[in-house]
Swiss-Prot record:
Pathway: Pyrimidine metabolism; UMP biosynthesis via de novo pathway; UMP from orotate: step 2/2. Its EC number is 4.1.1.23. One of its GO terms (cellular component) is cytosol. One of its GO terms (molecular function) is orotidine-5'-phosphate decarboxylase activity. This is Orotidine 5'-phosphate decarboxylase. Pfam families: OMPdecase. InterPro entries: Aldolase_TIM (IPR013785), OMPdecase (IPR014732), OMPdecase_AS (IPR018089), OMPdecase_bac (IPR047596), OMPdeCOase_dom (IPR001754), RibuloseP-bd_barrel (IPR011060). NCBIfam families: PRK00230.1, pyrF. Keywords: Decarboxylase, Lyase, Pyrimidine biosynthesis.
Length: 234
């Protein structure tokens, strides 16, 4: 169904000017995409900005990648749920107990609870960078390992590159959501993402949600680019 397909795009808002962000967002329809707010914007503008986006009708992915002791992370995801966000994430490398307690903290919110997603391996990390951290696995092996841990802890899915999506779907099941950054529409610059695919390639590989930032936010006609992306994955 095209509507469901169109809601697979999560636009990464990376602005240091709140009005510029709102001017951009107001060009979009909540039926055509969801929005991702990360550390930069949240640090600048805080929960009030997130609530404003929600009031405009958008589902918001609060991308703060919580990573702390279990009690602190549980309180943080509770605060995110009270804010009304659609999705929130934590670092899988925080461990099983941290992830499990975060999921338990969302239980009282019932069907209003945000999806809880784990970050596995950042898309800017390659094998060389992992080795510098003392991890001897390849990026793909580490993603699979951490994704299995996240599922065991009860999480709803993971952030992963499209290259891992097919294997993750096969091993962890269709209901385990895969959120994929590093997506570049055909003809876009790769930027600082080392593991990239086009939207259609990522969906075909098994990704459920695609994070796209600069190729849309910095486009001359962002609405047209978004429409093209949505059409490409119908």
């Amino acid at each position: 169904m095209p509507f469901e397909k169109s809601k697979k795009i999560l636009i990464a808002l990376d602005y240091d000017d709140q009005q510029a962000a709102l001017d951009f967002v107001k060009q979009l329809s909540p039926d055509s995409c969801r929005l991702k707010v990360g550390k930069e914007m949240f640090t600048y503008f805080g929960p009030a900005f997130v609530k404003e986006l929600i009031d405009l009708g958008f589902d918001v992915f609060l991308d703060l990648k919580f990573h702390d002791i279990p009690n602190t992370v549980a309180k943080a995801v509770t605060a995110a749920a009270k804010m009304g966000v659609w999705m929130v994430n934590v670092h899988a490398s925080g461990g099983f107990e941290m992830m499990s307690k975060a999921k338990q903290a969302l239980a009282p919110f019932g069907d209003k609870a945000p999806l809880l997603i784990a970050v596995t391996v950042l898309t800017s990390m390659d094998e060389t960078e992992l080795k510098r951290l003392g991890v001897e696995k390849t990026p793909q092996e580490q993603v699979i390992y951490l994704a299995k841990l996240a599922k065991e802890a009860g999480l709803d899915g993971v952030v992963c590159s499209a290259q891992e999506a097919q294997q993750l779907k096969a091993e962890l099941g269709a209901g385990f959501k895969l959120v994929t950054p590093g997506i570049r529409p055909v003809g876009s610059d790769a930027g600082d993402q080392k593991r990239i695919m086009t939207p259609k390639q990522a969906i075909d590989a098994g990704s459920d949600y695609l994070v796209i930032g600069r190729p849309i936010t910095q486009a001359d006609n962002p609405v047209a680019v978004l429409a093209d992306v949505n059409k490409s994955i119908e």
